[in-house]
């Protein structure tokens, strides 16, 4: 494709020409896929809906075929989600079908939310901020939820879909929509995944911190971006929201043990095996709100390709296309924390980790620029981690690590 480096639009219509691509630190696009077809029909509530189907040339109507439902972000469209992900490319390789529905109104999904906080928060924000839909009745009654169920049924009637291998993935508001669907209608899914915009924790737990769930276990993938922020009406911190979203599905899926972790370039993985289902957390370094272009491929290769449900609705696992990229040797620390992650286990540091910032202030009129940030832990803890002998001099002001380091 021809990359339009001057584009500054959220969803440029120019992408429809089948030649243009865009490249941004939140969303990267592919050329508009030739097999992507638009459809319109009344699916529920006498409302005409729009969706886009992608059927790869390798589709065999004689074979049971997996289905992926991919949900676009707020103010986007189904075709926008198709070009901003690699789902169609993975479908070409694997032979499954992908459907990209449009939200019914304002390009925004009907979502559970605390409406009073939404109104109060948006009143404090300047600029042309679109208003969420006011939720009415129960989640199962939302048109976007009902029509998605009907769309899946329609796809099963039209194609030879494997009912045990239906998956959903979404980006941003589409991630929140996917999470909502997974919690209330997830019994028809084997797995769900999303990038950006985790769910407000107040929608996940009741007042006794019991999970709110009508669907039961299913395999879950959560992609989180380092430079992302949760919506302001959540009224909770970014890390708090991410932690509770992870905790929620760990409880539902019976993931009681410590995860196995893997670090690949700017991607940090935590793999959780559960008694009822598996969870994957992918943390992306130096990434803004959105989804990485290869997010779909990673979700399929490491998770969706290895989970399915039987006719009774019970979740099962087989070997995924790629084995989990677990590091046997790993070491991680966090600011102000006394615990360190060492070789997929936890050890206690002698004092908490702290960070020191290298700054430049000369010639900046009293301001400063952070040029580097460095983690510090006790040398004695390093000696313990790497099974080395610690030698100190000058009352501890000088320390040596003696002997060859041993890993594991």
PLM segments and residue spans:
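Primarily recognizes the serine-hydrolase "nucleophile elbow" in alpha/beta-hydrolase
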Residues: 156-158, 163-216
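Alpha/beta-hydrolase
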Residues: 69-71, 195, 284
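Soluble non-cytosolic domains of exported or imported proteins
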Residues: 65, 78-81, 85, 138-146, ...
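A domain-start/cap signature at the N-terminus of enzymes
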Residues: 1-67, 93, 140, 144, ...
């Amino acid at each position: 494709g021809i990359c339009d480096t001057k584009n500054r639009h959220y969803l440029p219509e120019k992408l429809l020409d089948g030649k243009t691509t865009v490249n941004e630190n939140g969303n990267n696009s592919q050329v508009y896929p030739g097999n992507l077809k638009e459809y319109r029909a009344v699916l529920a509530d006498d409302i005409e809906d729009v969706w886009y189907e992608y059927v790869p040339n390798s589709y065999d109507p004689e074979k049971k075929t997996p289905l992926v439902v991919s949900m676009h972000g707020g103010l986007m469209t189904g075709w926008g989600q198709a070009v901003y992900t690699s789902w169609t490319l993975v479908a070409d390789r694997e032979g499954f079908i992908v459907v990209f529905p449009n939200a019914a109104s304002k390009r925004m999904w009907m979502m559970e939310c605390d409406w009073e906080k939404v109104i109060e928060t948006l009143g404090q924000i300047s600029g042309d901020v679109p208003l969420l839909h006011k939720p009415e009745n129960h989640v199962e009654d939302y048109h976007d939820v009902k029509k998605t169920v009907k769309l899946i049924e329609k796809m099963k009637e039209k194609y030879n879909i494997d009912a045990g291998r239906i998956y959903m993935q979404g980006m941003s508001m589409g991630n929140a929509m996917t999470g909502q669907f997974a919690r209330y209608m997830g019994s028809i899914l084997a797995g769900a995944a999303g990038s950006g915009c985790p769910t407000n924790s107040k929608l996940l737990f009741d007042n006794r911190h019991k999970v709110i769930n009508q669907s039961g276990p299913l395999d879950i993938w959560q992609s989180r971006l380092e430079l992302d922020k949760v919506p302001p009406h959540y009224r909770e911190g970014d890390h708090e929201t991410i932690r509770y979203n992870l905790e929620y599905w760990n409880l539902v899926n019976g993931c009681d043990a410590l995860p196995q972790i893997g670090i690949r370039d700017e991607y940090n993985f935590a793999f959780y095996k559960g008694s009822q289902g598996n969870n994957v957390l992918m943390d992306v370094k130096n990434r803004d709100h959105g989804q990485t272009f290869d997010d779909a491929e990673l979700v399929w290769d490491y998770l969706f390709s290895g989970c399915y449900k039987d006719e009774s609705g019970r979740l099962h696992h087989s070997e995924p296309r790629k084995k989990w990229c677990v590091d046997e040797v790993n070491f991680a620390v966090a600011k102000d924390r006394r615990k360190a992650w060492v070789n997929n286990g936890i050890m206690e540091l002698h004092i908490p980790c702290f960070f020191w910032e290298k700054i430049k202030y000369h010639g900046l009129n009293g301001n400063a620029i952070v040029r580097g940030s460095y983690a510090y832990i006790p040398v004695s803890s390093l000696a313990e981690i790497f099974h080395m002998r610690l030698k100190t001099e000058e009352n501890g002001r000088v320390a040596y690590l003696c002997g060859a380091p041993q890993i594991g």
